[in-house]
């Protein structure tokens, strides 16, 4: 009897285990189906809400300008284009509407000074199918004295600009310059700064999260490029040996021409006897200056941290270090 009881109890335990697994499976299936149905309902509600709360009509506006000396714009969310005009300068922008709500651009113009700002009536709606665009057409072959720009979110694309006093601040988006001659400050919180076929003269480029890419561009004076999280990539016709280079990075690769350097946490400096200085800094990212084909990078130089005793000799050794650097880079 005792053996039969033991066998029956064992069989009962197996049945209980099977029933338990089946119950768990059913509960999991019910939970999954309920989540799926709820997700579908939420997705439908979200899509419907976006449709009902989006601008659904637009109007293109244009303001002709006699001359253009300075530009000052402070805009929330839009794309900005600045380019040369084949005629007189003018500004063109898109206003967005839905019922009593509007997302407009407010313009002020006096004595060649143009000011643009966002004018929102009612609550700010979604821009699902309608994106506000502001286009500024510059006088051809004429210099703009200054541009002050503040943009919340959007891309800024600029071509054919000549300006010696830039002050750009973008929260989110990309900024690009092409065929331009610029001086001043350009900063971007989230997004990249791209410079192509242009001239930089005493510029300060900075991002928090985003790359700084300079290609086929002349660096005419002291330039500063800094990012917290992103790459600094420079590809220009000028030789590396024409610059005093001060570089610093925490995590990433540092390449000059076909030479890859390591251990530059304490900085890298080529010398002080050149006419132009290039200051480069990134916390996390690569610094690549006139990098050749990756397959041709054949040397790795380890920069040693100078000892306190050698600090007194740093000035006297700077020229010899610079000569060694020039020898390494004479073909770059």
Predicted regions and their residues:
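Right-handed parallel beta-helix
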Residues: 56-70, 79-88, 102-187, 193-199, ...
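A broad, low-specificity signal for short, low-complexity segments enriched in glycine/proline
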Residues: 41-42, 51-54, 69, 75-79, ...
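Contiguous N-terminal and early-domain "leader" segments and peripheral loops that mark the onset or edge
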Residues: 3-34, 156-158, 170-177, 212, ...
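N-terminal short leaders/motifs
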Residues: 21-25, 60-63, 121-124, 190, ...
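Alpha-helical transmembrane segments and their membrane-interface anchoring/capping motifs
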Residues: 2-85, 143-145, 256-258, 290-292, ...
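Short, surface-exposed interaction patches in beta-rich subdomains
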Residues: 178, 184, 192-332
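Short Gly/aromatic-enriched secondary-structure transition segments
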Residues: 86-96
